A protein has these predicted regions:
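A sequence-level/structural motif corresponding to short, flexible coil/turn segments enriched
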Residues: 20-445
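Bacterial Sec-dependent N-terminal signal peptides
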Residues: 1-32
């Protein structure tokens, strides 16, 4: 009879070493992600990049706001805040820049390239001079339609006596626009719906959706929320011509039926004409805020933001706040959720699909443990790539010893990545600071 003992022992040892716990499990095999350049643009005061898009000529454009009227700013008449739009070619050369606004506080939040190769911008304005022809009181939604060269074709203000802030714009299937942001319902005394809707009592800030024609004429408007603070940050049109709006809510009444505690991700689905079809709250007992939504490519949606919870819908939390990602069905059912971060404050601000079918997330991090292995000091810009199942493929922190944030990121045609935000650093990855805070542009590949 053959003695098989040595063979059996060898097989057992092979299995043991193959399953060694010294190998990291669940950590991404981080590839070398090279920083091609880091640029800061601005003047002696405060600048910030909020939104970036690919343009039809293979370049890109950035919208934010600027306070300075020196340094990199051109033809800006004073040091009030204005919308700041910058257009770059495919070789990263600045082709042109424009500021839009008046003599008060005007800040760009989001923009798109339109079907006619122009641009549509949204944010808020407190001005009633220069580029502004009206102000209804405090902050108004301010929408600007531009041609391909950045000239204003039309502009519209929407609001009442309170702080009404525009946060997102999309071009709709009928070639018009849907804009959303916060309506101060208390200050508007219940105004803001294009039709009377009964006796339900709203208060505080509500989601406000306004449908515009291609020429900027209001077709309808509707607000949604409760009696506390409800803030939308993003919107997407559905296949049936309705809309999904996402943001945060700490209300637990009127339109909100299932608040988990404090602020939740609050998602609403409205019809083509603004009728509320359903609403869902996702989160835990602490503060959870959704900031961006994208189509997952399989008929569902991915929503990113941050969470301070570790109960109810949030299965785990690494620390003070984690970047939180959920996958949701078209009916508003939670499919899965995933958190990323360390023991400090980590947040997600944008999500977009990449050419290889994965997803790019931008945000910020103060951690140097958990999913993070590096922190340059205070807040760093944080860039992550995940697969469709939410597995972290790689991530990169970029910053200096002061406060640096990423608010948006896109993949270019050559698969390089441009991330934008703001920076107060002048060391580490960021060599120059022009003023208090600068518009930050990072190219990685």
């Amino acid at each position: 009879m053959l003695n098989n003992t040595p063979l059996i022992l060898s097989f057992i040892l092979l299995i043991a070493f193959s399953c060694s716990k010294t190998e990291p499990i669940g950590k991404p095999n981080t590839p070398t992600l090279n920083i091609d350049f880091v640029k800061t643009l601005g003047g002696s005061l405060n600048e910030r990049g909020e939104s970036i898009i690919n343009t039809n000529d293979e370049g890109y454009a950035i919208l934010g706001y600027a306070q300075s009227n020196d340094g990199d700013l051109i033809n800006k008449p004073d040091n009030s805040f204005d919308y700041w739009l910058l257009k770059f070619d495919k070789n990263h050369n600045l082709e042109w820049q424009r500021t839009y606004g008046g003599s008060d506080d005007d800040r760009g939040a989001h923009f798109i390239q339109t079907n006619d190769n122009g641009y549509a911008l949204i944010g808020y304005s407190k001005s009633n001079d220069r580029d502004l022809t009206e102000n209804n009181g405090a902050n108004d939604f301010w929408v600007c339609k531009l041609n391909v060269s950045g000239d204003i074709l039309w502009k519209k203000s929407f609001g009442f006596l309170g702080a009404d802030n525009g946060n997102a714009i999309i071009q709709t299937q009928d070639n018009g626009f849907l804009i959303t942001g916060v309506l101060d319902v208390s200050a508007s005394n219940g105004q803001g719906n294009s039709k009377a809707t009964g006796t339900k009592r709203h208060a505080g800030g509500d989601y406000w959706a306004i449908k515009l024609s291609n020429s900027g004429e209001k077709q309808w408007s509707k607000f949604f929320g409760g009696t506390f603070t409800d803030t939308p940050f993003d919107v997407i049109q559905t296949k049936d011509k309705g809309y999904i709006l996402i943001g945060s809510s700490d209300s637990e009444d009127v339109d909100i039926q299932d608040n988990k505690g404090s602020y939740d991700f609050w998602v609403i689905n409205i019809s083509e004409t603004g009728m509320l079809l359903w609403e869902k709250s996702f989160g835990g007992s602490q503060i959870d805020e959704a900031h961006a939504i994208c189509d997952s490519g399989d008929g569902n949606y991915l929503i990113v933001g941050d969470t301070r919870s570790n109960d109810f819908d949030v299965s785990s939390n690494n620390g003070a706040a984690d970047l939180w990602l959920i996958k949701m069905s078209p009916e508003g059912d939670l499919i899965w959720e995933q958190n990323y971060g360390g023991v400090s404050f980590d947040a997600g601000r944008s999500i977009s699909k990449t050419q290889d079918g994965n997803f790019l997330i931008s945000g910020s991090s103060r951690s140097l443990d958990g999913d993070l292995s590096e922190n340059k000091g205070q807040n760093d810009a944080w860039l992550l790539k995940i697969n469709p199942e939410g597995t972290l493929l790689w991530h990169k922190t970029i910053g200096g010893s002061n406060i640096d944030f990423a608010y948006d990121a896109i993949e270019l045609n050559d698969k390089s990545i441009i991330t934008i935000g703001e920076s107060s650093s002048n060391d580490g990855d960021i060599s120059t600071n022009k003023g208090f805070s600068d518009l930050l542009i990072i190219k990685t590949k």
